[in-house]
Amino acid sequence: MKFLSFKYNDKTSYGVKVKREDAVWDLTQVFADFAEGDFHPKTLLAGLQQNHTLDFQEQVRKAVVAAEDSGKAEDYKISFNDIEFLPPVTPPNNVIAFGRNYKDHANELNHEVEKLYVFTKAASSLTGDNATIPNHKDITDQLDYEGELGIVIGKSGEKIPKALALDYVYGYTIINDITDRKAQSEQDQAFLSKSLTGGCPMGPYIVTKDELPLPENVNIVTKVNNEIRQDGNTGEMILKIDELIEEISKYVALHPGDIIATGTPAGVGAGMQPPKFLQPGDEVKVTIDNIGTLTTYIAK
């Protein structure tokens, strides 16, 4: 399944992509009319949080089938053209990010590969697919992109052993880790440079792990104005998905809806000669095989 959160007619909702259509089943409405018992999560985060007692996907499947068979299926579908995509997990939980997890990317920025580099991104930085974000020209002329695979956590745990780590994964999404390279180079921490308003585009969907079991050999391509800038593969990650979860959970308790950004391949603007930073009016597309394409526009 492909889950998403969205705004329609000024109301926030969530849903699951309609198969073979650019449309979403509005699960707020579907559950209101076809839920079994009192199962009626109001947000995707609430659904994930209840997944430990009920099979969330099975509840979704049953409710959608009932809507399809009702004779009024179209009443529960909304075209992608009519919605505003929100970050898939809404309201947002923690976003924990790994830097320097691709050797070639670390090398292009002259960073040490051996040292673990972890940071968080502010919840206020999150935005969805097709968003226009500020150009931040008032504070920087070094706005950069980083296309990344995101892991969506599906159940709570800490000190999770590598052998069990994948049991805690609910699915995967796409992240563009927008970065102010000027602030990053001037400061001893990454939080501010990584938490600009609009600095964490995410989506368009969460693809559940039954559809994408282990994306450790999928292509990540980032284009700026249709020019390929990053052309990498998750097989290049230094720490794999199970190792990332094991490492983070040694220190931080993970909960449903938490997102782990797994690092970016080579090809960022700061690594080019001369550097090629984002400019007002730019279009940035991050595509990951079997998930989709995340599009972001830089305000003029």
UniProtKB/Swiss-Prot annotation:
> Which InterPro entries does the entry mention?
Fumarylacetoacetase-like_C, Fumarylacetoacetase_C_sf
Instruction: Give residues annotated as binding a divalent metal cation.
Output: E146, E148, D177
Listed Pfam families: FAA_hydrolase
Return the SUPFAM superfamilies for the record. Answer: FAH
Q: Does the keyword Metal-binding apply?
A: yes
Task: Offer an example of a GO molecular function term for this protein.
Answer: acetylpyruvate hydrolase activity
Name the keywords, alphabetized. Answer: Metal-binding
Q: Which family does it belong to?
A: Belongs to the FAH family.
Q: What's the protein here called?
A: Uncharacterized protein SAOUHSC_00906
The organism encoding this protein is Staphylococcus aureus (strain NCTC 8325 / PS 47)
